[in-house]
Amino acid sequence: MSTEARAFGVYLHWPFCLSKCPYCDFNSHVAARVDQSAWLTAFEAEIDRIGALTEGRVLNTVFFGGGTPSLMEAATVQGILDRVRATWTLANDVEITLEANPGSVEAARFEGYARAGINRVSLGIQSLDPDDLRRLGRMHSVDEARAAIGIAQSVFQRVSIDLIYARQNQTLAAWRDELSRALDFGTWLLGEKNAQRLRFRERAIRSWSWQCFLATQREREEFLKAN
């Protein structure tokens, strides 16, 4: 078996958030206090367990998801990645990603993540419209989103942002404008999630017609190809 065929990725889940977004059906929980040393010990034990089953394999991706991984202390991320490096051979071009929410972005913490080995940050912007941010239950503002992107770009070469499309009352013109503004940030990658596939909790958010959703999706594809 070739080295490429034996390569694999590791996903590390940090399940804690400052609040629960209404569309989120991931394993995430609001906690006022988290014993990060205990969680580091648990991560290390799980890495050891999986490492014993994957001996000799090459690691080409590591992804910290959540939840809100940017609530982790840099020392916790450092400890996890130290155990990862001690357990597996890392590919020369290994991508080590950490998801972050704009409201929990701090330059000093990001610098600590970079020293630990993080080389890509994915920012959960979700929308550049204040009303939509409120409807989506997001805690950050558009200004905080812009600031977070700037901080991330000052530390990391690879920064991506997530946007949710086909949102309630969103027009094609508004989506085109939002895509244009997102690309103006100069991020390395733009990821999108469509609202039709997200489950909303506690309150109903009226969805678009199927025809309007498809038009939005086509607009996204055509716009990104042209830019």
Sequence positions of predicted segments:
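N-terminal [4Fe-4S]-dependent radical SAM core
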Residues: M1-V10, E55-R57
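Sequence-level motif detector for i,i+2 pairs with an aromatic at +2
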Residues: A5-A7, C21, L59, D93
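Short beta-strand motif preference
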Residues: V10-L12, L123
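Local cysteine-cluster metal-coordination motifs and their immediate loop/turn environment
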Residues: H13-S28
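Conserved non-cysteine loop/helix-boundary elements of the Radical SAM core domain that shape
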Residues: S28-L53, R57-A226
